[in-house]
Amino acid sequence: MLLSDRDLRAEISSGRLGIDPFDDTLVQPSSIDVRLDCLFRVFNNTRYTHIDPAKQQDELTSLVQPVDGEPFVLHPGEFVLGSTLELFTLPDNLAGRLEGKSSLGRLGLLTHSTAGFIDPGFSGHITLELSNVANLPITLWPGMKIGQLCMLRLTSPSEHPYGSSRAGSKYQGQRGPTPSRSCQNFIRST
């Protein structure tokens, strides 16, 4: 069940849903607006000939922070990682779904490629997969609204929430745009 604004506020007030920093003006009818942090991960196109999800490629991306007061410019066809300004902590009975903002989508900005689902038990900043599909550069301002997080109540609490030893939670506690750790659980079929 999708939580309404009053349910979202009740979960936050009770301390079950953690959002830091929390700004009540970001609560929408059935979602919470999320803001863009100031750190980005850009791909180093000259370090590798290709991306291999089975291998650890430590120098695949570099962390970039724009000069204070300046935006990050995302060029047409470019893909970078960003993250939410807010740190989210979900209880074992709520899952999240990150969606883009309609106004930004109409400018050609995609907020996430595939990873819009947030497991119950997750705690950390949400990594954003930012793409510019427009034919002009888009400026990304730290602190701007970048997406919205919908919360879904599970039918029962998760038996093994994200962060538990059984869940294999490789992104638990992440801060800033976190590169892929796909090699940690990559499986090849034989």
Curated annotation (Swiss-Prot):
Gene3D superfamilies, per the entry: 2.70.40.10
Q: Which GO terms describe its molecular function?
A: dCTP deaminase (dUMP-forming) activity; dCTP deaminase activity; nucleotide binding
Renumbered to this chain, region (Disordered) spans 160-190
Q: Which domain of life is it from?
A: Bacteria
Residues at which dCTP binds: K101, S102, S103, L104, G105, R106, D119, T127, L128, E129, Q148, Y162, K170, Q174
Q: Where is this site: Important for bifunctional activity?
A: G116, F117
Pfam families under this entry?
DCD
Classification via InterPro entries? dCTP_deaminase, dUTPase-like_sf, dUTPase_trimeric
Function, as annotated, reads:
Bifunctional enzyme that catalyzes both the deamination of dCTP to dUTP and the hydrolysis of dUTP to dUMP without releasing the toxic dUTP intermediate.
Subunit composition and interactions: Homotrimer.
Under the heading NCBIfam families, the entry gives: dCTP_deam
Family statement drawn from the similarity comment of this UniProt entry: Belongs to the dCTP deaminase family.
Put simply, this protein is called dCTP deaminase, dUMP-forming
Organism encoding this protein:
Mycobacterium bovis (strain ATCC BAA-935 / AF2122/97)
Primary gene name: dcd
